[in-house]
Design a protein with these regions (language model features):
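Multi-pass alpha-helical membrane architecture of UbiA-family
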Residues: 2-316
Length: 316
């Protein structure tokens, strides 16, 4: 008779609190922690705050009116949830690379199963559909569908993550052009005094994200090379990739400043030029330090700083 190993949860009378895929027992608390890790909460802050910044560009202090505030919070939640869904899809497709690059991710530690992640994605999409139905804005819905489309082609098929240039582009377009379009569409793209405001902001943010996305590839260099993924880090090396990030970061901020000078985007954006020294100093520091940790977090903080400072300086 084969030996039957009894789960510690059952020994303690806690069997009802665990899920046991493939004979391995995962307590509910670890599943919850795994779901939180799956969503990568820190990366959800940027799209949530970006929604408020774009809305402020259009409405100014009108964002604090109850109706507008509720609308913005709902849209911001939709964008943040969509980013969480994108993170989950990416982790489903990156199991091979994550065993090398990110062994602490929930699918690798077996805190979650692939079925758990797929279930989360399905429920997340149902919530997105509910939000789109409540908002009833076809342009916003198209923007959300577009962002989801790019998430799928980046991670699944044709998996542009492995294709040079296309990997950065398929992240920059949804987070830059489409993210801005989603919020502008709620209040009317031409609601601002200058009809080119959306285009200017969206292009500048897209350039910023296109360059900044390289920072996440530094830590993943080893696994990406083994998986045949071609990006700026695996093709040119960390130092040259960081130089490119510095140039693109500076380009986006200079572009915003020029557009502000000619009143195409809010005047306050021209003061973003003061962030250039910060960009270069940090980028060059990381380049020569050859650090593989922390820079992706810096990108998100820097991105939020650019957006928030621009909003605060709106009336200057």
């Amino acid at each position: 008779m084969p030996h039957i190993k009894i789960c510690e949860c059952n020994k303690n009378g806690l069997g009802h609190l665990c899920n046991c895929p493939n004979g391995k027992h995962t307590p509910t608390s670890r599943k919850i922690q795994g779901l939180i890790a799956l969503m990568r909460p820190f990366t959800l802050i940027t799209p949530f705050f970006a929604a408020f910044v774009y809305a402020y560009v259009i409405l100014g202090l009108g964002i604090f009116e109850p109706h507008n505030l509720l609308l913005i919070i709902t849209a911001a939640f939709a964008l943040a949830l969509l980013n969480a869904i994108s993170n989950a899809i990416n982790q489903l497709s990156d199991i091979k690379e994550d065993k090398i690059n990110k062994p602490n991710r929930p699918l690798i530690t077996q805190d979650l199963t692939e079925l758990d992640v797929f279930t989360f994605v399905c429920y997340g999409m149902l919530i997105e559909i509910l939000i789109l139905t409540i908002l009833g804005n076809i342009r916003f819905a198209l923007a959300i569908i577009g962002i989801l489309f790019f998430a799928i082609i980046y991670s699944l098929y044709p998996r542009t993550k492995r294709l040079f240039i296309w990997n950065n582009l398929t992240i920059a377009i949804p987070r830059g052009l489409l993210g801005a379009y989603a919020i502008f569409s709620l209040f009317g793209i031409f609601a601002t005094s200058n009809p080119y405001c959306y285009a200017g902001l969206a292009i500048a943010v897209t350039i910023f994200v296109f360059g900044g996305n390289t920072t996440k590839d530094i830590k993943d260099e080893t696994g990406d090379k083994q998986a045949g993924i071609r990006n700026f880090v695996t093709v040119y090396g960390v130092k040259k990739a960081m130089e490119l990030t510095c140039v693109l970061t500076a380009t986006s901020i200079i572009l915003l400043s020029i557009l502000a000078w000619y009143d195409i985007v809010p005047k306050g954006e021209q003061f973003l030029i003061v962030l250039l020294p910060l960009s270069f100093v940090y980028c060059m520091y990381e380049k020569w330090k050859y650090s593989k940790f922390g820079l992706w977090n810096y990108f998100y903080v820097h991105f939020m700083l650019v957006l928030v400072v621009g909003a605060l300086l709106w009336h200057i």
